[in-house]
Amino acid sequence: VNNMEIIQGIIEAAKIEQAPLILQVSAGARKYASHIYLMKLVEAAVEDSGLPICLHLDHGEDFEICKACVDGGFTSVMIDGSKHSFEENIELTKRVVDYAHNKGVVVEAELGKLAGVEDAVKVAAADATYTDPDQAVEFVERTGVDSLAIAIGTSHGAYKFKGKPELDFARLEKISNLLPNFPLVLHGASTVIPSFVEECNKYGGQLDGAQGVPEDMLLKAGTFGVCKINIDTDLRLAMTASVRKHL
């Protein structure tokens, strides 16, 4: 989430479905909107909806940003040390986990690298690496992290696949079997809803070839321990389509 309008739209949908929410804030959004404004908007969302709402930092790149969000009232934080070596990622993640757990805040980490661009996270397709199942077990055991974002073929942005959508479900199943009942996370998992793409293009957008993760694949991932699916691109497409249509 970046502003009041996005939060309002999400809340209205959640009220209709009577569904709990995880509202994610990137470091860029936090800088743009200001921490205190975001906190007040989320407090208003809780009061307005009466629903359980979690405020989560997405892709925190260092200990300092995670600490600031923990101290500032976030429910959970993500430390993304995927650009570092395996050992450095463990060291950084454990430092965040130790601090956050002492404050009652849960932590998500990432192992493997997703291609694509999101906020300050930029990874070329050639540099993307899938999560090693055996390393995932060691990583969780040594860090004490609460959930783990894994790489099995999804990517950030609206252009997730050049051809037929494919995810490495064999890899996901192995990770799930090695980490039974452990929460796994898929980033870059928007479906890139065709009607939103068509609406954007109809009113001047240029999203030819945009393609996301089919819903049936997301449902299948849910049977292998994936309990959090990030869909920022779909939210941006919905808002962009509406803004283009009305302006």
Locate predicted features.
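Short catalytic/ligand-gating loop segments at beta-alpha or beta-beta junctions
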Residues: 187-191
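C-terminal alpha-helical cap/extension of soluble enzyme domains
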Residues: 202-207, 213-247
